[in-house]
Amino acid sequence: MTRPHMAPPDIPQAHPKALGYLRDDVSGQGWQQDEQAILALATRLGYDLVKTVRMNPDIHDPLHRLLIIVRRLDIAAVITPTLEHIGGPGRICRVCSLITVTPEYNWALAYKPSEEGGR
């Protein structure tokens, strides 16, 4: 009789993937500081920051484009400097969690759009 192979319990688990997101018109000249803040928060929370996406104001429906990337890369959370970059958590939280740097807050996956205004 053969035994099934069992992996040793100390194999490290992969970190959940995060995607940084910022809008150039909101970050302005401070976009590099915003990128660093996103990276620092992702690292502290145990996420693997896959990349940071910067959108300029000329892009039509930037959240739609962001959600395409989120789905393709199987992202667990989008991290953004402030809620102003996203406009509200509703669309993002149908697909993944949304985390803001300032104030630091996490809107979980499956967030209810009726809760748009608060925590």
Region annotations inferred by a language model:
Residues 1-119:
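Short, structured surface patches at the beginning of a domain
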